[in-house]
């Protein structure tokens, strides 16, 4: 096959099968070659240029879920100047597409130069502004909670990132539902439509006038501050709450401008993530934004003790940190919620034992370990006393590798890949399973595992048997042989043995599942999670001398004795 008969496909978002279908429709005579997004991102810009220069064929197809939400469209169109294909095509799941050729790109040069100049101005202004803000922080008095028209304003100063199923979306919607059940009034301010148990205010933005997405994110913070400040001036909240992320500083500035305490939800250091997992550009700006957010926060909410230790190592006092693990809505995740029908739809037989994994197909979720365990178990099926079937729910950077490795078993009906599904549908797949697995692996460099997987608590609430890695917080939440079978992290042999043991012992599955749900209901609901955050604001207002003691004592299960809802009614 000649080089001219190839089309290279890079899937940024959306489903790979949709991208391949588009490629075959537009280029029916061409061979579609998938490019690895993970390898491109990990290699840096020099490696990316080298890979692009090696592409020779009909087209480079860059595929996403929605063209309107595509970051850095000008940069992607400019790839036509680097590779040796005839054209670059940007396409999305709806079938919309834009074609860029070398001649056509000349018309984009003026716009590209303006975008580059705009980005330069944004980077310089933000750098100077945030450096001055750090100086002013030393002079400003830290704001204290005061009586407000409502309890909490949840800030998501990012133009995207919450629309796709995953832990971030689950945490945001779960926390907001917990606030509502606790009787608190909240409002969400974000850059995209989102279904939540509160009023949602959309702050529009634009990426089309920027060359780099980092500049677009930084400038969006400024737009976000102006819009939210105007809205909150009309109806003031008692607390600001922001989920920490890359290039975010809006919550910090709004807190000091309006004199409202900021609660920062801190799930990881973005600087550390950029070094070890998810490469980033413009690192000095990323670090500066993180420093500003941490310095300005009155309370930092972390999901695990290792994260608390990391913050204390960089100078954050223990009194400013609340350990508050992720949680679950047990009214949504519960046994007998559609699994039986799904089993029929999937052709699962009564004698088969279903093992389910839900999550991102990435390294730290342990999918490579799971793959080895599955191969080991299915290769010895003929010697086993029970029939196993695996249900793998989700998507991610290692999905193509996992699909290829398990393809013989998938074709035999022993492994089912569902791809990404809406979070509201996850419970049916969990309910269809007999065993749920969470094979997380250790962090690089022997760093403590700092995560708090939301799926872990969803597993528990479903009342199913769990096989999980004995890893930091996972081992703190689960108890071996009482609520789960815990195995050595990164050991496919131990994972396989645990699955085999559960598969052959139905009574053990029932006991572990029943105990796990009891623990989830007692300590790990979103309502309890939200209550611990609200207690900070209520107790600071009612007794400032008691606040330090309360915050340092709060941890998993130690919920304040006074009901925040009754105190809040008095404040109103």
PLM feature segments, named:
Residues 381, 393, 400-430:
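Nucleotide-activated donor-binding/catalytic signature segment of Leloir-type glycosyltransferases, i.e.
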Residues 97-112, 169, 222-226, 258-263, ...:
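Nucleotide-sugar donor phosphate/pyrophosphate-binding loop at the beta->alpha transition
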Residues 306, 327:
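Carbohydrate-associated surface elements
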Residues 494, 501, 508-523:
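A short, well-ordered alpha-helix in the C-terminal region of glycosyltransferases
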Residues 1-35, 131-195, 556-563, 567-572:
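N-terminal subdomain of nucleotide-sugar transferases
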């Amino acid at each position: 096959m000649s080089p001219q008969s190839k089309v290279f496909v890079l899937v940024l978002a959306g489903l790979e099968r949709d991208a391949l279908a588009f490629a075959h429709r537009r280029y029916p005579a061409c061979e579609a070659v998938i490019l690895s997004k993970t390898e491109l991102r990990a290699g840096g810009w020099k490696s990316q240029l080298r890979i692009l220069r090696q592409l020779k064929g009909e087209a480079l197809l860059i595929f996403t879920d929605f063209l309107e939400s595509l970051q850095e469209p000008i940069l992607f169109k400019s790839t036509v100047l680097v590779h040796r294909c005839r054209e670059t095509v940007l396409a999305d799941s709806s079938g919309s597409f834009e074609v860029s050729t070398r001649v056509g790109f000349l018309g984009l040069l003026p716009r590209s130069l303006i975008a580059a100049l705009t980005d330069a101005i944004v980077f310089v202004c933000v750098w100077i502004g945030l450096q001055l803000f750090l100086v002013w922080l030393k002079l400003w008095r830290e704001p204290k909670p005061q009586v407000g028209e409502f309890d909490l304003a949840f800030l998501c100063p990012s133009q995207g990132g919450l629309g796709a199923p995953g832990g971030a979306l689950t945490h945001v919607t779960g926390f907001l539902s917990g606030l509502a059940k606790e009787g608190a009034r909240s409002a969400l301010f974000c850059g995209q439509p989102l279904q939540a148990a509160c009023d949602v205010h959309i702050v529009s933005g634009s990426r089309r006038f920027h060359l780099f997405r980092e500049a677009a994110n930084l400038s969006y913070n400024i737009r976000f501050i102006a819009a939210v400040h105007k809205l909150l001036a009309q109806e003031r909240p008692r607390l600001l709450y922001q989920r920490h992320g890359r290039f975010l500083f809006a919550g910090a500035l709004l807190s000091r401008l309006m004199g409202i305490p900021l609660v920062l939800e801190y799930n990881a250091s973005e600087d550390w993530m950029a070094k070890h997992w998810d490469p980033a550009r413009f690192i000095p700006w990323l670090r500066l934004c993180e420093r500003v957010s941490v310095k300005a926060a009155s309370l930092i909410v972390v999901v695990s003790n290792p994260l608390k230790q990391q913050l204390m190592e960089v100078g954050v006092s223990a009194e400013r940190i609340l350990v508050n693990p992720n949680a679950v809505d047990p009214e949504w995740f519960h046994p007998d919620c559609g699994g039986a029908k799904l089993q029929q739809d999937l052709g699962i037989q009564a004698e088969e034992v279903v093992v389910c994994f839900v999550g991102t197909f990435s390294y730290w979720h342990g999918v490579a370990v799971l793959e080895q365990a599955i191969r080991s178990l299915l290769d010895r099926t003929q010697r086993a006393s029970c029939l196993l079937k695996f249900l793998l729910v989700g998507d991610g950077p290692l999905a193509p590798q996992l699909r290829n490795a398990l393809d013989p078993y998938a074709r035999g009906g022993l492994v089912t890949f569902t791809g990404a599904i809406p979070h509201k549908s996850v419970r049916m797949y969990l309910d269809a399973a007999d065993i749920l697995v969470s094979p997380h692996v250790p962090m690089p460099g022997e760093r403590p595992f700092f995560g708090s997987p939301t799926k872990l608590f969803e597993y528990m609430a479903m009342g199913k048997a769990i096989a999980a890695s004995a890893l930091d917080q996972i081992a703190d939440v689960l108890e071996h042989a009482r609520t789960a079978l815990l195995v050595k992290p990164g050991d496919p042999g131990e994972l396989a043995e645990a699955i085999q043991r559960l598969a052959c012992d139905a009574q053990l599955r029932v006991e572990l599942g029943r105990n796990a749900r009891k623990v989830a209901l007692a300590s790990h609901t979103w309502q309890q999670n939200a209550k611990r955050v609200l207690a900070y604001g209520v107790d600071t207002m009612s007794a400032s001398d008691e606040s330090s003691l309360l915050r340092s004592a709060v941890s998993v299960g130690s919920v304040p004795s006074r009901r925040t809802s009754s105190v809040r009614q008095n404040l109103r």
